[in-house]
């Protein structure tokens, strides 16, 4: 959708430039606005784009300065806040660089900009050097320090209170999680439902979502429904439509196959494991049943919601592929047929 809108604005040409440049200041529109400007001539709005790029880089450095010195230890809440600040720094830095790239030789910068999406620091450093050499050196250079992994000293003793007033809803929620009463974070609490931020903390431990930035876990946590099952209760029947996948919050789940009138447990999954995702992805009936082996709590995500997540989050698709590869490799690991 974003690309289609950008293409449409690109065909309008110069008359669209003013409104697109103005929309850069809106956080929810800046990404799409940059995509449109990459197809347009700036026609006299270069100074505005330069100011926006400098502001984005300054915001990135501020978030990095707040997040980098945090030493989480074993506190999952501190890990969440630190990773969220660094993810915001990363996002703002890339936005600033995309804006800076509009001020120079765009064709020379295109490959470098693509390299900014990778996580390898060496590739990013090379991309920054290319962008710096082509133009906007004063904007780009401060980011070299950030992506070199330097850790600044913290000078503000009230940094956490400051973050609790941050304009970003997500950062405020992460800060409030630390300022408020400490909650059980092992996911074994006996509440009827997990609070939203506790769901996010749990999802960070699930390898299916390990590559997602923390803010991207919030919509997943919001659509997931919590269910509890008693010992021996069926979670899903073999042959049923794969209309939902489940993430085990606590307890064990037996994977059961029925054949020739006999039931056989082929695997047991536990907390943090994802079950039922293969039927959801393939749109085929479930190849095995899911039975609670003792008290079990799960977070369930419906097929439509999961497909939407895969479309919007390519990193999640990669996680799914890894899970499927592991599932396919298990018979070989057990000495069975490949």
Please report, for each region that a protein language model flagged, where it lies by residue.
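Short inter-helical turns and helix N-cap capping residues of alpha-solenoid HEAT/ARM repeat scaffolds
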Residues: 1, 25-29, 89, 119-121, ...
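Structural detector for internal amphipathic alpha-helices that build alpha-solenoid repeat scaffolds
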Residues: 1-12, 19-23, 31-43, 65-72, ...
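Amphipathic alpha-helical scaffolding segments comprising HEAT/armadillo-like alpha-solenoid repeats
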Residues: 12-25, 43-59, 75-80, 105-116, ...
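C-terminal accessory/binding modules appended to enzymatic or scaffolding proteins
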Residues: 85-109, 126, 153-181, 199-204, ...
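Regulatory nucleotide-sensing modules
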Residues: 197-261, 265, 275
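A small-molecule sensor/coupling module
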Residues: 198-199, 216-219, 280, 285-287, ...
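Short beta-strand His + acidic residue motifs that chelate non-heme Fe in jelly-roll/DSBH
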Residues: 255-256, 277-278, 288-292, 308
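Long, acidic (Asp/Glu-rich), low-complexity accessory segments flanking structured domains
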Residues: 271-272
